[in-house]
């Protein structure tokens, strides 16, 4: 664990979580602090919405407020963003790209070691394909297609076609703020999105369970 006290006078600290025992790491890091702000670098740890809420609970318990989360893990970025936190995805060359809900910027794609990062809405007729995981900051409109060898993660609405685990990986998953696809595929399984609207404030996740694709909220508690 590394702790970098950026401004102790104003109780602004930055910490890095390095192990699966991140909750205890965080408790030890903020011990002795009362009120202030904290920036968390969770590295490659895969944090769910439930995990992020636990981080917030621990910090709030001593009056600390999380101002941002940095990570190399796309799932953690989607989880933090879904809960309204500032999130920064670490790409190649130690560059952090801020995750925002404003998609008016020009589209751009960047390839990380195990991730294709795309910023911008995919429109009808457009195809985004990669052998690794794909993270999209924007909507996938009807008529657009996403094909990934790994997971598909969308900070936006999935209204087109998405295929995760295209080489047969049935452990792959598809996550979005709203899953209403024309077609959903994981490995060799096919499904359509539900008609019901998602619960407010919750991302949705599609996985294979008992040989069928199941869509459920990414629970925050």
Curated annotation (Swiss-Prot):
Gene Ontology biological process terms, A to Z: cell morphogenesis; division septum assembly; regulation of cell septum assembly
Entry keyword annotation includes Cell division: yes
The entry's keywords: Cell cycle, Cell division, Septation
Keyword Cell cycle (UniProt): yes
Pfam families: MinC_C (PF03775)
NCBIfam families listed in its UniProt record: minC
Cited function: Cell division inhibitor that blocks the formation of polar Z ring septums. Rapidly oscillates between the poles of the cell to destabilize FtsZ filaments that have formed before they mature into polar Z rings. Prevents FtsZ polymerization.
The family this protein is said to belong to: Belongs to the MinC family.
Subunit text: Interacts with MinD and FtsZ.
Name this protein carries in UniProt: Probable septum site-determining protein MinC
The organism of origin for this protein: Prochlorococcus marinus (strain SARG / CCMP1375 / SS120)
Lineage, highest ranks first: Bacteria, Bacillati, Cyanobacteriota, Cyanophyceae, Synechococcales
Gene that encodes it: minC
